[in-house]
Design a protein with these regions (language model features):
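Solvent-exposed beta-strand/loop surfaces of large extracellular or lumenal domains
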Residues: 396-417
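Carbohydrate-binding surface patches
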Residues: 353-390, 430-433
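Glycan-recognition and catalytic regions of carbohydrate-active enzymes
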Residues: 322-369, 402-406
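Aromatic- and carboxylate-enriched substrate-binding clefts and catalytic-loop regions
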Residues: 139-302
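Conserved, mostly hydrophobic/aromatic
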Residues: 128, 203, 230, 312, ...
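C-terminal beta-strand-rich structural cap/linker in extracellular carbohydrate-active enzymes
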Residues: 412-438
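N-terminal accessory beta-strand-rich subdomains and adjacent acidic, glycine-rich linkers
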Residues: 1-89
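An acidic-aromatic substrate-binding cleft motif
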Residues: 63-135
Length: 438
């Protein structure tokens, strides 16, 4: 109900509402030169606002306004599968070649142990190679590397070269304050490219005024010219422009595992886990950084829930949060090794309820992966396998009743149309991998 929204408080969009027997999500698309749009309740109305530029702004020359759009759907499956916000953005320039853009899984050190140390990098690349993952992210801290006469750039090139020798490419974290102008963007990213990186994670971006929204476009053009994959962090929400710039594989603009972290005394409310797939994810991929297994960071969630996050929260460049120590030799190492990050088909399971439970079927080629994340209340859900073509080998990961940092694993044969019933703990989850055998 509108009355549950605090009056005068700016809301990030898409904003999703249940209307009658259907759903409406309100958002914006193709925002390049306007300030980012917020929404605010005034009485019984929802109005547009501009939190970053409340006094307005002056435009000289051409004015390019974004689209204000409403996605209307009969059910959550129709809502999630809408391409409206993306299709309202211009297609990529046909003269531009994006064949070099490669999605993949990313190992990452900062969440589990903060600033990466120069002398520790080889073991992380070794672990990424053992997992069969495509990338390793060198996060904040590399700027202070030094060894003998080598400065940070020489140290960076050394570890990137080591990663290449193991078949693992590198994505590099940078602070946006290093490149505020177009010339600074080019010069700084040229150094990153020269060091051998194939991608960039740009952090601490200022509030989304019209000037900063134009800065995003400059960054996208420069990363394209240098053939660097792009991930914006600490940033504005997406507005569908991945259609224009396919090398922007993901961006943050979401409360993911960097919010849910004990060293900052922050815990993700469980209902939010089942809200974001039907709000923020409608605008584009989210760098949620899923799948923490270390027991001290579960904070009420379960291992199956954490694994399911990587299926429910889509990101063509998926940075897995935890240390490799919790992935290698885990009961689901094979699933982590094989899990796709791009999908050919998505089905929202009918038992899904915004804020309570989210269940997704994702197809990649001939395989189906099912992920379920549960909210604050234990529940039992059922779904059928009518999407299968015949029989399949199912690998099932479910909650263990007595422990968060554990799971139940089962291998079985299932058939098309079979009904599956799942008991979910509070903060629990469920994963099923299906491989055709007919």
């Amino acid at each position: 109900m509108l009355q549950n929204i605090p009056a005068g408080e700016a809301l990030v969009n898409p904003l999703t509402a249940v209307v009658g027997n259907g759903y409406v999500a309100v958002g914006e698309a193709d925002c390049r030169t306007f300030a980012d749009m917020g929404l605010v309740r005034e009485g019984n109305l929802i109005r547009v606002c501009f939190p970053a530029s409340p006094e307005g702004w002056t435009v000289e020359g051409e004015l390019l306004s974004p689209w204000r759009a409403a996605i209307v759907a009969d059910d959550l499956n129709g809502l999630v599968n809408s391409d409206l916000l993306t299709n309202l953005c211009p297609a990529s320039d046909p003269s531009r070649n994006f064949d070099w853009v490669k999605p993949g899984r990313v190992l990452w050190q900062w969440w589990s142990s903060e600033a990466p140390k120069f002398e520790e990098q080889q073991v992380w690349y070794d672990a990424a190679a053992r997992l069969g993952w495509e990338y390793y992210l060198i996060d904040d801290g590399w700027r202070f590397w030094k060894e003998g006469d080598k400065d940070q750039w020489q140290c960076l090139k050394e570890v990137i070269d080591y990663g290449k020798s193991k078949g693992v490419q590198s994505v590099i974290w940078v602070d946006s304050k290093e490149m505020r102008t177009r010339a600074e963007i080019h010069d700084y990213l040229a150094k990153v490219k020269e060091a051998g990186a194939v991608g960039i994670k740009i952090d601490f971006i200022p509030a989304p005024t019209p000037e900063i929204m134009r800065w995003y476009q400059d960054a996208l053009e420069e990363t394209y010219d240098l053939q660097l994959l792009c991930n914006f962090h600490g940033c504005v929400k997406p507005s569908g422009l991945r259609r224009t710039w396919p090398h922007e594989l993901t961006r943050e603009a979401v409360r993911g595992h960097e919010f849910h972290i004990s060293r900052y005394d922050r815990v993700m409310p469980m209902n939010q886990e089942a809200i974001k797939p039907f709000t923020r994810l409608l605008a584009g991929p989210a760098d949620f950084t899923p799948t923490a297994f270390v027991p001290s960071e579960l904070l009420g969630y379960t291992w199956p829930h954490e694994l399911a996050q990587a299926i429910v929260y889509t990101s063509p460049l998926t940075h897995f949060a935890d240390s490799y120590k919790w992935y290698l030799n885990s009961p689901v190492e094979d699933l982590l090794r094989d899990m796709p990050v791009v999908w050919d088909e998505t089905i929202v399971l009918p038992f899904s309820e915004i804020g309570r439970v989210a269940g997704f079927v994702r197809r990649h080629g001939n395989e189906y992966w099912i992920g379920v994340v549960n909210g604050e209340d234990a529940r039992t859900v059922s779904f059928d396998l009518g999407f299968l073509q015949g029989r399949a080998l199912a690998t099932v990961i479910s909650d263990r009743p007595e422990a968060d940092d554990a799971l139940v694993r089962e291998e079985k044969i299932v058939d098309r149309g079979e009904t599956i019933t799942v008991s979910l703990r509070k903060g629990g989850g469920y994963v099923m991998r299906l491989r055709s055998i007919d």
